[in-house]
Amino acid sequence: TILNSDAYQRTSAKNSKNEDDKYYYSHAYIKPLSAEQFFYSMLEATGFERLQKRRDKNQLESMKRNYLRRFIYLLDNGEMEEIEAFNGTVPQALMMINGPLVNDSGDHRQRGSLINYILKNYRTTKDRMKRIYLTVLSRKPTSKEMTHFERYMKRSLYNDKKLAYEDLYWVLLNSAEFALNH
């Protein structure tokens, strides 16, 4: 019942009637994910459990705890801010650019990686793109995004077009849309 309520279904898109509303909850407010929300979103978007499927459940949970501990350590800004006030840091940006969670899941050659899985199981550019968007942003790409990516694929200098899917995945993971609750 709650999921079907008008309040729960609010969008962050403003219209002419609620553009200046700050008090009456006429639209959802955009806010950064907490550090833990961001971490668990990363685990889902990267397919972490699929990459680690050879491990038993206890090992997997232990790895998650260790990653979470390191993740929160990286996000600590040293000013005793609450972890709920997470707005991103330089170490977080570096982790998103070069970290093993992002790099391992985005490598199309690595068996079990998200991109490898998508390229194996989906044949068309459209289907592959939809799956990447649904996995990372929990939505389908717009027609404008589809057109833009198809144009990117055609103009890409890559000999191996699979690398363009890695780029798309990396860009979506590093987008504001991924890091914000909207």
Located regions from the model:
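An acidic, gly/pro-interrupted, aromatic-rich
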Residues: 3-142, 172-182
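Helix-loop-helix junctions that connect adjacent transmembrane helices in secondary transporters/permeases
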Residues: 140-157
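Short, charged, surface-exposed loops that flank catalytic or proteolytic processing sites
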Residues: 156-164
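Globin-like tetrapyrrole-binding proteins
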Residues: 168
